[in-house]
Curated annotation (Swiss-Prot):
One GO CC term on file: plasma membrane
Highest taxon above the source species: Eukaryota
Record organism: Petromyzon marinus
Organism classification: Eukaryota, Metazoa, Chordata, Craniata, Vertebrata
Domain remark from Swiss-Prot or TrEMBL: In addition to the well known disulfide bond common to G-protein coupled receptor 1 family, trace amine-associated receptors (TAARs) contain an unique disulfide bond (Cys-24-Cys-186) connecting the N-terminus to the extracellular Loop 2 (ECL2), which is required for agonist-induced receptor activation.
Effect annotated for changing Y272 to A/V: Abolished activation following binding to cadaverine or putrescine
Subcellular location: Cell membrane
SMART domains on file: 7TM_GPCR_Srsx
Bilayer topology annotation: Multi-pass membrane protein
Any Pfam family: 7tm_1
Protein name: Trace amine-associated receptor 365
Gene field: TAAR365
Length: 365
């Protein structure tokens, strides 16, 4: 019986010899257009790696950022960092040259980690939404409900997608029933094909259910935040007002940041889940160029997350500033109050301009 790999190798589609005996689908992208793609993709990869590395270092270094919420945020940044290191460079070569230079086995490994890391981001965002919901809805029992054990169990649950996608892609379960489509693929292409059962399961459990839960959680959080703000204003007196408002503002700052990140995530990922599901149902009609464009929408989500942290969360913004300015190397800033960091030193103006360039001119909240 012919294997799926042999089916691709015996493709009857007219392919072109692209580079050094690699046979790929014809690509009418001009050299000028290819240069533009490279000029866009390389900075995106660099920002993804640098920004998420900055997030990881910030959480590991500054004590104020070492909260249970940020344990989940740390793993989200690690997942995004791995997307920049392991996924985007190889996908960039495929996008620019419309060819896969690394063999069929590595194509499956690449798809495995691509889906694993992206699904991991979805699940981590869902866990962070639950954490924020508990912090706002039940603040007095937050530390009883969100314990170290709870965080460990949530992380374990999220990482279960690693062996799941490993079995699916390495055993080619996602390609069962797609022999006809595979026969039309060139030998050195790396197709991202999902049969209907896997596409539906991936969409429902990797998109629809988490996004519904996140939307409901943040909708409820918004209602509770407004109620708490009114209650504090009407019941607190004198210095108690400032203290209560300060505590509430810090919780809301983290919640607003994660809410924005979830909103951006849904916007960037929805096209992929819609197209992948409809393609599986009605047949694969979208061009390889369209697929690459949609895939890069999902990768860009890993690029923008650290930018959103810096733009909408003052502690993270100040942490990035202290790292880029080099102040963490001159004296101990591990215990600094990241809500109140002075930016006035002349030595640090270059770093301040660097941060401003990266995140734009955002006013402190």
């Amino acid at each position: 019986m012919e294997t799926l790999n042999e089916s691709i190798r015996n493709s009857s589609l007219l392919c072109v010899e692209a580079f050094h005996n690699f046979h790929c689908t014809y690509n009418d992208v001009s050299e000028a257009e290819r240069a533009i793609l490279i000029a866009i993709i390389i900075p995106a990869i660099a920002i993804t790696i640098f920004g998420n590395l900055l997030t990881v270092v910030s959480i590991l270094y500054f004590r104020q950022l070492q909260t249970r919420t940020n344990v989940l945020t740390l793993f989200l940044a690690v997942a995004d960092l791995l997307v920049g290191l392991l996924i985007m460079p190889f996908s960039a070569m495929r996008s620019v040259y419309n060819c896969w230079f690394y063999g069929w086995t590595f194509c499956k490994i690449h798809s495995w980690f691509d889906y694993t890391l992206c699904t991991l981001s979805v699940l981590l965002l869902s866990c962070i939404s639950f954490d924020r919901y508990v912090a706002i809805s039940d603040p007095l029992r937050y530390h009883q409900r969100i314990t170290n054990r709870t965080c460990a169990l949530m992380l374990l649950f999220c990482w279960l997608c690693l062996p799941f996608y490993g079995l699916v892609f390495m055993l080619e379960w996602n390609l069962v029933g797609l022999e006809e489509e595979l026969a039309q693929i060139c030998p050195d292409d790396c197709p991202v094909l999902l049969n209907l059962p896997f596409a539906m399961a991936n969409t429902i459990f990797g998109c629809v259910v988490p996004m519904i839960l996140m939307t409901l959680a943040y909708g409820r959080i918004y209602q509770l935040a407004r109620q708490q703000a009114r209650k504090i204003t009407s019941t607190a007196m004198g210095s108690n007002v400032d203290s209560a408002r300060s505590s509430l503002r810090r919780e809301h700052s983290a919640t607003i940041t994660m809410g924005i990140i979830v909103g951006v995530f849904i916007s960037l990922w929805m096209p992929y889940f819609v197209v992948s599901t409809t393609e599986s149902i009605f047949g694969y009609q979208a061009s390889s160029l369209a697929w690459e464009f949609i895939n890069w929408f999902t990768y860009i989500n890993s690029t923008v997350n650290p930018i959103l942290f810096a733009a909408f969360n003052r502690p993270f913004r100040n942490a990035f500033y202290l790292i880029l300015s080099g102040r963490i190397f001159s004296s101990s800033y591990r215990g600094v109050d990241l809500f109140n960091v002075q930016h006035g030193s002349k030595v640090n103006q270059g770093a301040k301009r660097c941060v401003s360039t990266l995140i734009g001119k955002e006013s402190d909240r």
